[in-house]
Amino acid sequence: QDSLKKIATERFDYLSIPTVEADQLETLLTWVKSYRENKYKKMKIVMPGYDGDYEGVINFSNKYIKTATKTYTPAEYTARIAGLIAGTPLTISATYAPLNEVIDCDKYDLDENDEKVNNGEFFIWYDGTKYKMSRAVNSLVTTTQGKQEGYQTIKIVDIMDMIYDDIRTTAQDSYIGKYANTYDNKCLLITAITGYLKELEGE
C-alpha cells in the first residue's frame, strides 16, 4: 500500500507491476477505480490474466511469451505491453501492432481470438507470419447507459482521459484563483474549452 501511495504522486498514464501476484490483482483494481473515479487521476493498469471488467484495466491474457533470449511470464511482459500502448500516438491504434522480438506464445484459432477479444482480453497472436497484438480493447465487458461500447476501446478511453486531464489542468493553472468567480470569467473558461475541443476535432 505504501508503494501504491508513492506511485500515485507521480504523473503517468499506464502502469504495470511485473512482479505482481494473483492475490494482489483485485486490490489493484480497487485502487485504480478509486483514483480514476474519486481522485481525478485517469490512470490505467495492465494486469496479467485479470478480467477486471473495467475501462481502466487492460487484461493481458497470454499464458507465456518467448523471445530469442528469454521466456516471460504474463506479469513480466505487462511492462512491454504498457509501454507499447503508452507509446502509441492517439492518431492511431495499438490494434495489430507488431512485436518483432516475439518468437513464440500461446496460439489460438480465429474463432478463439474473436472470443477472447469479446471477453475483454488484449493479447499477442500469430497470424502465420508474425506476432502482433489483438484488437486494442480494455477489460470492460459489461456496458451500461453511461458506458457504452466506446468505453471498451483503449484508444477512445485514452482520448477521453487526455481531454479530461487537459481541461482540468487548464482550469487549475490558468483560471482557478487567477480570476474572480464571475459569470463573465466562467464564460472565458468555457470559450477556451470550446476552442480546445474544436482544435481536437480538426485534428
Q: Could you tell me what each predicted segment is?
A:
Residues 85-203:
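Structured, hydrophobic secondary-structure cores that serve as assembly/anchoring elements
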Residues 1-97:
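Extracellular Cys-Trp
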